[in-house]
Amino acid sequence: MERRTFLKRMWQAGLGAVTAAGAWTTWDILRTFPEGGLGGVIRTVLDQDVTPEEALYVRTAQTYLTRIDGAVVALWQRCPHLGCRVNWCESAGEFECACHGSFFNRAGEVRAGPAPRGMDRFKVEITVDGIVEVDTGEVAEGAPPGTQTLDEPPRGPGCAEA
């Protein structure tokens, strides 16, 4: 085999490998998530298990479920400030972001801290058999600062303060 032919084939093989890697990366970014995984519809818990006093964490949906004015609300665990995980503080009855000190009420509305808006939400549907389904494929932005639909001060000391 001549040197020229060898180099030509090596260039073709290299170009093919780069094209395949680019196609794989593009497919991986653009593909939809399977049903039951983040980015899709996730069946969670029974409607009756979601109470107005607490926030129930659903790991597969990366979501907290709570009940506001009789309706189940799904709040994304991600802080809208810089994306840290927001935790439910049972003693205070509110959500706290330990990264930069944002506080959110039970409805996910920002109460204090650097967060630019309330916690983002996912669409919720209750099936005929009473299962709460969370559609994590579409994110609804949280309420702007100053929105306070719940008149609930913290119940006690915050978890970050303890």
Residue ranges and their predicted role:
Residues 78-120, 125:
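Structured, soluble extracytoplasmic/luminal domains of envelope-associated proteins
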